[in-house]
Amino acid sequence: MNWYVRLLQKYPYRMAVTSTSSLFMIGDCVSQRYFSDKPYEPMRTARAGIYACAFAPAMTAWFRFLGQQQLPVIAKVAIDQAVFAPSSIGYYFSVMGLLEGKSPDTIWQSLKNQYWDTLKCGWMIWPAFQLFNFGIVPPNFRVLASNCCGLVWNTFLAYQNANKMEKGHVADLVIEEVKEEVKEVKQEVLAEVKVIKGFVKQ
């Protein structure tokens, strides 16, 4: 565990890219395996990994920026959900559309159909987790903690991106499963943080 802590401290952006891309690809694999009747598409998983490589540095920089602000935790979470969450969802659907070779008009239509439902779903999950993340998790491990929760969220994003849903429709079953998984992830991350703190003190 000590070696991982040292790598996080020495190469925060590289480690963020590695963990984020890995978990985005795993999330896509899970989405294809359990929420799709189509044959597995390796290129779809590869696109998820490529997107994550571009997204991870921005997420790391954002967490560092928020972590440096002398604000209450609740204020940091509010800013995160008012600024980063809406922009990151739009960025996801736009970049994935470009990687899939869609036209700008098609990407715009996908955003109109899926953006608001996805954002509302995110607001049911991420604020509570980010309160835990900014309030308890040490700064060096916040990206990793978000990625652990993000494994479930990425599965949902992959599902949303692959299914061109009508406006106003939300995958209720998927959302409930995501919320349950997030609860489990929070417990697991809290346990890991306690272990990591013990190693750091040594």
Swiss-Prot record:
Signal sequence region: none
A Pfam family annotated for this UniProt entry: Mpv17_PMP22
InterPro entries per the UniProt record, alphabetical: Mpv17_PMP22
GO CC annotation, single: mitochondrion
Record keywords, A-Z: Membrane, Mitochondrion, Mitochondrion inner membrane, Transmembrane, Transmembrane helix
Source organism (scientific name): Yarrowia lipolytica (strain CLIB 122 / E 150) (Yeast)
Family statement: Belongs to the peroxisomal membrane protein PXMP2/4 family.
Keyword Cytoplasm: no
Cellular localisation: Mitochondrion inner membrane
Name of the protein: Protein SYM1
GO aspect biological process, one term: ethanol metabolic process
Superkingdom per UniProt: Eukaryota
Summary of the function given for this chain in its UniProt record: May be involved in cellular response to stress. Required to maintain mitochondrial DNA (mtDNA) integrity and stability.
Membrane-spanning residues: 15-31, 48-66, 82-99, 143-159
Transmembrane helix in keyword set: yes
Topology within the bilayer: Multi-pass membrane protein
